[in-house]
């Protein structure tokens, strides 16, 4: 099985790259985020590879990091999620944002993925919520905030600050993670304006 490929970028397709490894061109399917991050044709690149072997074909999927590949595998443990949907999810949400979305039970963020409806998004969140801590360094403050939001126990300044960041164009998982970190740093009595300021500082790191 192929686990990693290192070579020169030959060309790009809609959802794949041709990687020239010592004169052999490998067609490797990637998320749109991975494709956008790869260099121009003729330049060197390294991809972690997941190899799928079927009766009628061998298909390669490529990732910039082993971590992204682990998420690709994990997503496919969810009912109705195959390789195509898993790549689409990773095209919409990078691993850290996906982890935060799942920790925050943010089905809407996952459902923004083309081809993923509310039911599949709900399955992804519900089936993976207990597996996220083992795979990602999710801030414990995010997990705590998730429970508070679920039970409507989150302080008003916190919810207002999250809404403000979302209105500024940040995704819900990003905004919630930033405000969770801000609230942890500022304390329980922090005002909305202070949380927004600290949250923006977190997002700029």
From Swiss-Prot:
GO biological process: DNA recombination; DNA repair
Chain segments carrying region Domain I: 1-64
Domain of life: Bacteria
Alphabetic keyword roster: Cytoplasm, DNA damage, DNA recombination, DNA repair, DNA-binding
Transmembrane segments: none
GO CC terms in record: cytoplasm; Holliday junction helicase complex; Holliday junction resolvase complex
One MF annotation (Gene Ontology) recorded for this entry: four-way junction DNA binding
Flexible linker as annotated region, ranges: 144-154
Region (Domain III): 154-205
Compartment(s) where it occurs, according to its Swiss-Prot or TrEMBL record: Cytoplasm
Amino-acid biosynthesis among keywords: no
Statement: the UniProt record of this protein carries the keyword DNA repair: yes
Family annotation (InterPro entries): DNA_helicase_Holl-junc_RuvA_I, NA-bd_OB-fold, RuvA, RuvA_2-like, RuvA_C, RuvA_C_sf
Disulfide bridge partners, by residue number: none
Region (Domain II): 65-143
Protein family (similarity comment): Belongs to the RuvA family.
Entry-linked HAMAP family: DNA_HJ_migration_RuvA (MF_00031)
Subunit structure: Homotetramer. Forms an RuvA(8)-RuvB(12)-Holliday junction (HJ) complex. HJ DNA is sandwiched between 2 RuvA tetramers; dsDNA enters through RuvA and exits via RuvB. An RuvB hexamer assembles on each DNA strand where it exits the tetramer. Each RuvB hexamer is contacted by two RuvA subunits (via domain III) on 2 adjacent RuvB subunits; this complex drives branch migration. In the full resolvosome a probable DNA-RuvA(4)-RuvB(12)-RuvC(2) complex forms which resolves the HJ.
Domain comment quoted from the record: Has three domains with a flexible linker between the domains II and III and assumes an 'L' shape. Domain III is highly mobile and contacts RuvB.
Function: The RuvA-RuvB-RuvC complex processes Holliday junction (HJ) DNA during genetic recombination and DNA repair, while the RuvA-RuvB complex plays an important role in the rescue of blocked DNA replication forks via replication fork reversal (RFR). RuvA specifically binds to HJ cruciform DNA, conferring on it an open structure. The RuvB hexamer acts as an ATP-dependent pump, pulling dsDNA into and through the RuvAB complex. HJ branch migration allows RuvC to scan DNA until it finds its consensus sequence, where it cleaves and resolves the cruciform DNA.
UniProt-recorded name of the protein: Holliday junction branch migration complex subunit RuvA
Organism of this sequence: Rhodopseudomonas palustris (strain BisB5)
Lineage of the species this protein comes from: Bacteria, Pseudomonadati, Pseudomonadota, Alphaproteobacteria, Hyphomicrobiales
The encoding gene: ruvA
């Amino acid at each position: 099985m192929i686990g990693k490929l290192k070579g020169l970028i030959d060309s790009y397709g809609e959802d794949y790259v041709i990687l020239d490894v010592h004169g052999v061109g490998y067609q490797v399917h990637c998320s749109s985020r991975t494709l956008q991050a790869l260099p121009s044709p003729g330049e060197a690149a390294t991809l972690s590879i997941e190899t799928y072997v079927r009766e009628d074909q061998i298909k390669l999927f490529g990732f910039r990091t082993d971590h992204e590949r682990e998420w690709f595998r994990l997503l496919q443990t969810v009912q109705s999620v195959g390789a195509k949907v898993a790549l689409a999810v990773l095209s919409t949400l990078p691993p850290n944002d996906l982890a935060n979305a799942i920790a925050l039970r943010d089905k809407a963020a996952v459902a923004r993925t083309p081809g993923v409806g509310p039911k599949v998004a709900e399955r992804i969140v519900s089936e993976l919520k207990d597996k996220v801590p083992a795979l990602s360094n999710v801030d414990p403050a995010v997990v705590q905030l998730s429970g508070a939001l679920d039970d409507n126990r989150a302080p008003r300044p916190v919810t207002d600050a999250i809404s403000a960041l979302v209105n500024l164009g940040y995704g819900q998982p990003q905004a919630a993670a930033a405000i969770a970190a801000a609230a942890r740093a500022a304390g329980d009595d922090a005002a909305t304006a202070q949380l927004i300021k600290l949250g923006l500082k977190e997002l700029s790191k």
